[in-house]
Every structure is written in structure tokens, then in C-alpha cells.
């Protein structure tokens, strides 16, 4: 049996895949090492989102390779191992590659390891064997055939056995994307959207809740397209009804990557009806000017988007809406950029993430004329971030004096010995949004009610007015320390 250490780069979907690999390895008797130094095999789950992510991936692979002993092996798995397999496989020290559709074979790779082995990619057009290669490049006998339909299905049926859980966990409900946005490479290595069966999702959600998870974050490349390949209309709303039927009311369900053209009346009503569903929606929009959106190959109807946001706020008055945008897309004029700023000022999103346009080889956007200079992109990024910083602060100030429920994530001690706890409200997704801080020692994984006393640009401070134990309110307060 081998000791394995997994390093995860990139998005929450990658984190779920790493947890899947971890569970498969543990089920086969392998142990997970706390560090690369202690491992027989180091797996780097790579990211290929944009050029900067690929540069980080290669840097991490080089760093791990430089430190590994002659007995250790290095596996590059995931997105960049799929999208740029030749480059990854040629990186000195990488002993094997495993693409995004192959990670359920990780135990086989670990157990049949050969020095300088590599894995042949799956051919999406026909059945194909996974063939380990010797250091001389001569094919070894393949252990057995693997058909592509099975490969696509494996990730949907493979159990995600998490060895350790925190207050929140990601649950991936689909993989791949049917959209073909001009700037995006993801469909080229993820393929079309493929949904996980509702029953499998419910089983995973119940396991997470039974393990003590208090927040389940649903993720996908395109969350609101869920179930289309299964023949479902309003698939996400149907799934949410089923999830909320099996989860206790004290478990949050959060929606991320919910594209607007999949949001309709039924989904909005479902979000408003169930107490488990956070009044929060991450809705990527990318831009707000119709001409920019057309070049992006995104729906250009900004007026429809405004109406959708109005509908969401009418049905769920306290909803926190997050969006992401791209600045510096080819041909973005100053007029188009100003229209984006005006849109943010008008709509008043609670949370916003902004990407600088990255010219990705092979995408339609890379061939567009009028590519913007990096200095212009950088200037526009800073301008839009300054605007959103002010908007975020103003949105936060609306909560002064009000009580918010907070999921406690951690605690610590200041230099002068005061205990400080930190968590998130329903308005804050893990890793990308703000936090709520308060004095005192609260137990991670519990809910507390906090009265907001200070609003910063992205975070809130407050005083605890009550704690929750299970599903019942306890009328007591954590004593403030100073």
C-alpha cells in the first residue's frame, strides 16, 4: 500500500474531484500523507482555466519534482493534464498524467506504477484503452479496456468519500458545459454538460449532513443547466426540492455558477420556499453591454437580466446576488466599459468578482481584432474594483443593527489574549466573499446569531446575541471578551 499526498489547484470542482480520488485511494487501503515529503506518490490536481492558472500549475509541478526523491512518484491529474497533456507529461519529474475524465482510475495508476509512466488520453469518439508506457515509450500490456461511455459515467457514480469534513463542503452536480463562450476553453477539455443522477446527489448530501457539514455548496460549470441531458425541465428546481426534503432545516444549501438564462419562475419560487436554501445567488454575467456580450457569444439582453434581478429581489427581498465580469475583452470600447460601470452602479450587486481578459489560444476571442493593451485592461480592472468596493461597503451598511445568522468557521487568539471567532452569513460564499467577525470563542461548525455593529468594505463585525444547538434555539449568549 502507498502513502499519497494530493495538492489541489483551481476551483471548487477540482476540490470535489480531489476528494473523490482521496476516497477511492482510501477504499483500496492506501493512506493519505499530510505532506509531500511523507508520500510515496504526490498527485497534483491541475488547473487550466487561464494562462496564469497554467503557469501556476507548471510551477507547482516543477517545485514538487525538484524536491522528490528517486523513490517518489509524481502524478499530474485534472484539467491541464487533459488540455495540455503533452506539455504536462514533458515536465521533468512528472511520472504519469490523468485527465479530467479519468480520475476514477487513480487507484489503478498508483497500484501499477512504473517509472516514467504516462497515460494515453481517452478518445472521445470511440472506445480506447488506457495504456501505460514504459520509460522507453513502449506500450505495456493494458490491464483492461475502458470504454468512453463508462469513463463519462464513472465520475457520476464514483462515491465521494471525504476523509475529513469542515463546516461546509462542495457538491458537484454536473460537469462540462454546453455553452461555447468565445473566451472560454473549458468545453474543449471538459466536454458537454453531464449531470449526476438525483439519487446519487441525494445520497452524497445526506452523507455530508450526517458527517456534521452545515453548508452544502452546489457547484458545476453551469449549475442552472442541470438535468437537461437527463430530459428534465427545471432540473435544478426539481433537484433542490428533493435535496431539501432529505436535509434537516439547519443545513444550508448554496448555489454557485448559476447562469441567468437557466433561472426561471419555478427556480426562484423554489429558492424562496425552502428554509435550507441560502438567500444567495452567484450569477456570472461577464459584461453588461450588448455588443460586448455578442462578441463574447453570451446572451446580449441586458434588459432581461435587469428584470430577472428585480424578480429575484421581489421574491426574496434579502437575497445577496454575486456576479463576475470580464474587463478588457477584445474590442471593448470606453463606451462599453462605461456601460458596465453604470450597470454595476444601477444594479448594486452585493458581491462582484472581476477577471482581466486572458487571451486563450484556440478560442474565438483570441482571433478577434482590437485586442486591448495590458495597461488598459489593468486600469479598467482597478476602476471597476474601486467602484464595487464602495458599493459593497454601502450594501454592508444596510445590515448595521440587524441580526444575521453566522456559520462559525474558526477561532483564534489575538496577541493580547482576546478570543476572536470568524464565520460567514448567508450573504457570503466560502473563499470568495466576506466574513463576519466577533469577539469570543464559538465552536466551528455551529450557528450563532450576531448583531452587526460595524460594516467594512467586505466584512462585518458584531456581537453574539444567541447560539443554536442542532435545530433548537438556546437562549444564551457567548460572553464578549472586552
From Swiss-Prot:
Q: Where is the TRAM domain?
A: 397-466
Q: Which organism is it from?
A: Roseiflexus castenholzii (strain DSM 13941 / HLO8)
Known Pfam families for this protein? Radical_SAM, TRAM_2, UPF0004
Q: Where does [4Fe-4S] cluster 2 bind?
A: 177, 181, 184
Q: Which EC number(s) does the record attach to this protein? A: 2.8.4.4
The residues the record assigns to binding [4Fe-4S] cluster 1 are 11, 47, 79
Which cofactors does this protein require? [4Fe-4S] cluster
The record lists the catalysed reaction(s) as: L-aspartate(89)-[ribosomal protein uS12]-hydrogen + (sulfur carrier)-SH + AH2 + 2 S-adenosyl-L-methionine = 3-methylsulfanyl-L-aspartate(89)-[ribosomal protein uS12]-hydrogen + (sulfur carrier)-H + 5'-deoxyadenosine + L-methionine + A + S-adenosyl-L-homocysteine + 2 H(+)
The main location class comes to: cytoplasm
Root EC class = transferase
State the protein's name.
Ribosomal protein uS12 methylthiotransferase RimO
CDD domains on file: Radical_SAM
For this protein, the record's HAMAP family field holds: MTTase_RimO (MF_01865)
**One of this protein's GO BP terms?**
tRNA modification
Q: What does this protein do?
A: Catalyzes the methylthiolation of an aspartic acid residue of ribosomal protein uS12.
What does the entry list under GO cellular component? cytosol
Which PANTHER family does the UniProt record give? Answer: RIBOSOMAL PROTEIN S12 METHYLTHIOTRANSFERASE RIMO (PTHR43837), RIBOSOMAL PROTEIN US12 METHYLTHIOTRANSFERASE RIMO (PTHR43837:SF1)
Q: Where in the cell is it found?
A: Cytoplasm
The record's section on PROSITE patterns has: MTTASE_N, MTTASE_RADICAL, RADICAL_SAM, TRAM
Where are the annotated coiled coils located? none
Q: Which InterPro entries match?
A: Elp3/MiaA/NifB-like_rSAM (IPR006638), Methylthiotransferase (IPR005839), Methylthiotransferase_CS (IPR020612), Methylthiotransferase_N (IPR013848), Methylthiotransferase_N_sf (IPR038135), MoaA_NifB_PqqE_Fe-S-bd_CS (IPR000385), NA-bd_OB-fold (IPR012340), Ribosomal_uS12_MeSTrfase_RimO (IPR005840)
Alphabetically sorted, this entry's keywords are: 4Fe-4S, Cytoplasm, Iron, Iron-sulfur, Metal-binding, S-adenosyl-L-methionine, Transferase
Tell me which residues make up the MTTase N-terminal domain. Answer: 2-115
**GO molecular function: any one?**
aspartic acid methylthiotransferase activity
